[in-house]
């Protein structure tokens, strides 16, 4: 299952080899610039003993926008830029006033973006100029490190936003995100220092991922193994796609007294693994006609679509007008749901064509029995200790990979007896392959690797991980795995809007990341 690809914020628009809307690119450049400055002043005030939790939370929300997932509504985006600039000036003014009062020599950042005349043409032009300045002032390697940092911040912010849906406790990871981002304010930061910052942040990033899993299980119940229907039932319907379970829950609460059927889409299928969602009679199952085309799924669904927070696909114009979103900014043709007022969405569902008959496609399993899984993992650990296993291979953090199954067929055929595979994508009954025929997020694989690490010295025992799907969180997964002690990481062939060829080359050279070849035998030999 592909969990969503994002439009990477990189230099392709400046270099002219990818199709990002140049106006949106320029606006994003201004957003990035203003966010760097507001983060700088926020941290300075924090160092002086002033804390503004609401502002910190808003900055984290803004940071979730720094990589484009779809074409934003420009008017809303302009309004957001204006709001961020106003907040930046306010915290800058407070910092300057404090410095003057205490007669301190405080560093004020130079601002290249002028907001005196706030109109689209002026801001776009300044964004273009800022992109040129940024690209000309940084070396290729430092630009790649900036790109990695932005990817990690985006991924971490998304997860932190969802995490904050379940707790009001202080989360030190928020400060970790802002401190990493603040490093981008200093052009003198060397490559070696940035690499260290990235590696240090891996622990924070992993803790966010781990905490989110724990809090969701506390709130929705422990993940279990469940059967889920793929298809539709007769009636009016709403399709929900994205990543934020709290948004799905809020919708289900809003429609619980109606006859509207609700279906999950794409990676949101994991909601069915949590017991709390079973109580909602309106949640009928999962709708997905294509494993690789959101466009097709949305156009064939006979009802409105709710794009919940952190949905990351580029959207076609064909179904604009019946798309709704809980995101901070709506995409073109979308209606934004504000303050959990789902009435416009419910009205759209009531007025939609709906499905005139039941249509069942399949039954699939979602989730896992953790106790049973760990019993099997303990047996693997014993085999490792007894030296029956010489190399452990993990194939797929997510299920149903985009990589061609023929590659894995050959890998399975040529797997030696002293190699063991834990996989979510190779349906095999071989004694040295543990296959999970179920949909779930990456939390299970992380749990397995973390458990193995407690009993096996990963500095001495070889473990290789094949990431089989490229998406918004791929960069995050790379450094989570490295934090867990996995040094042999293989990537599939990612599209350039996820990982550019230049970035892949950089990851290979600086972090020893590998890419699968077209020869599984060779890859096995080189493990």
Where are these regions (language model features)?
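Anaerobic metallocofactor- and corrinoid-dependent redox/one-carbon enzyme cores
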Residues: 2-53, 57, 96, 104-106, ...
């Amino acid at each position: 299952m592909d969990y969503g690809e994002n439009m990477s914020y990189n230099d392709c628009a400046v270099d002219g080899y990818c199709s990002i809307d140049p106006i949106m690119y320029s606006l994003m450049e201004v957003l990035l610039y203003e966010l760097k400055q507001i983060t700088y002043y926020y941290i300075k005030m924090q160092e002086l003993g002033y804390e503004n939790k609401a502002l910190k939370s808003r900055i984290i929300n803004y940071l979730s926008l720094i990589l484009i997932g779809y074409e934003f509504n420009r008017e809303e985006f302009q309004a957001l830029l204006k709001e961020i600039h106003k907040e930046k000036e306010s915290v800058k003014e407070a910092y300057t006033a404090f410095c003057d009062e205490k007669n301190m020599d405080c560093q004020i950042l130079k601002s290249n973006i002028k907001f005196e005349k706030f109109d689209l043409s002026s801001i776009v032009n300044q964004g273009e100029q800022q992109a040129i300045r940024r690209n000309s002032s940084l070396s290729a390697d430092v630009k790649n490190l900036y790109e990695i940092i932005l990817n990690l911040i985006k991924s971490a912010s998304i997860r932190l936003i969802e995490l904050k849906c379940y707790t009001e406790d202080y989360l030190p990871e928020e400060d970790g995100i802002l401190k990493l981002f603040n490093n981008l304010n200093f052009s003198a930061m060397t490559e070696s220092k940035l690499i260290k910052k990235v590696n240090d942040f891996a622990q924070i990033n992993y803790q966010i991922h781990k905490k989110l899993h724990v809090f969701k299980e506390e709130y929705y119940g422990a993940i279990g193994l469940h059967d889920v229907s793929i298809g539709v039932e007769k009636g009016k319907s709403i399709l929900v796609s994205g990543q934020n379970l709290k948004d799905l829950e809020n919708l289900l609460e809003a429609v619980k007294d109606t006859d509207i059927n609700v279906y999950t889409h794409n990676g949101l299928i994991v909601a069915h693994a949590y017991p709390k969602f079973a109580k909602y009679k309106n949640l009928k199952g999962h709708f997905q006609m294509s494993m690789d085309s959101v466009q097709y799924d949305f156009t064939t669904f006979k009802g409105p679509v709710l794009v919940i927070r952190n949905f990351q696909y580029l959207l076609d114009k064909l179904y604009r007008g019946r798309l709704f979103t809980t995101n901070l900014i709506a995409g073109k043709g979308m209606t934004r749901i504000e303050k959990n007022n789902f009435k416009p969405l419910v009205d759209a569902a009531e007025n939609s064509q709906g499905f005139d008959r039941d249509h069942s496609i399949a039954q699939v399993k979602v989730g896992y029995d953790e106790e049973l899984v760990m019993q099997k993992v303990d047996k693997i650990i014993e085999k490792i200790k007894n030296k029956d296993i010489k190399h452990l291979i993990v194939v797929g953090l997510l299920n149903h990979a985009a990589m061609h199954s023929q590659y894995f067929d050959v890998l399975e055929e040529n797997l030696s007896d002293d190699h063991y595979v834990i996989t979510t994508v190779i349906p095999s009954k071989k004694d040295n392959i543990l296959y999970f025929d179920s949909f779930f997020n990456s939390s299970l694989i992380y749990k397995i690797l973390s458990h193995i690490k407690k009993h096996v010295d990963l500095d001495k025992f070889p473990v290789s991980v094949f990431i089989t799907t490229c998406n918004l969180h791929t960069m995050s997964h790379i450094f989570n795995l490295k934090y867990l002690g996995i040094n042999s990481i293989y990537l599939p062939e990612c599209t350039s809007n996820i990982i550019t060829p230049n970035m892949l080359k950089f990851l290979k050279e600086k972090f020893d990341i590998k890419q699968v070849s077209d020869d599984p035998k060779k890859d096995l030999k080189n493990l």
